[in-house]
Amino acid sequence: MKRILTVAIIVLSSYLQARAQEKMKPEETEIYSPVPVKVKPGAAFRDAPSDAIILFDGKNLDQWVNTKDSSAASWIVSDNAMTVNKATGDIQTRQLFTDYQLHIEYRIPSNITGSGQARGNSGIFLASLPWGPGGYELQVLDNYDNATYVNGQAGSMYKQAIPLVNACLKPGEWQTYDVIWTAPRFSEAGLLKSLASVTVFHNGVLVQNNTTLLGDTPYIGQPAYRKHGAAPIKLQAHGDKSEPISYRNIWVRTL
């Protein structure tokens, strides 16, 4: 009964928040303290296990499409990595997923410029949705020596969950995210039955520990849930002017 009541409260809260979001400013959902402690990660990359679905092996983008029109993904493939093409926008997987384990590696270029949110910004949307903020975003950003609001730094679930620590490596080094994603569940009528949850290891260090989400991850306003099923995984081409980042060695295991 307590769980049902909690979910009902969240549903009502999501509705009321959605009505108020248009009047909010981005700064109203930015948190600047406490700042997560920096830790130094170990060095290790993980090969895909035998039951993994390979989403990117460094050769082509066959498993990806452009988000805006579902055409063939047009990011740049070179040296076993894909680099964001900011001119063509986000890309997402052809395949849809519900619950899964994800491994992905990314690199902020060594010549990165900019500051705050305009420095190596990208994002991994653990379920890409065609409305609102576009889903549930795990932030990608250079925060090795770059301050920003802490619920928007690398390792955060954007504007919703601050990372436990700052495990960022220097620009120019390959970094890893290992994610366990459990999608939200909805009734046939669209009522929320269970919240989304996520566990994230950043460069082998725990930064999100079975974190439950109150909804999607908007830039402006409060999170909200809306009924959806299985969804693609999306990589963001952020509109900031800093040099584009790269990804490699992406695989997923369905759970």
Regions found by a protein language model. Give the residues of each.
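Carbohydrate-interacting regions of secretory-pathway proteins
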Residues: A20-L255
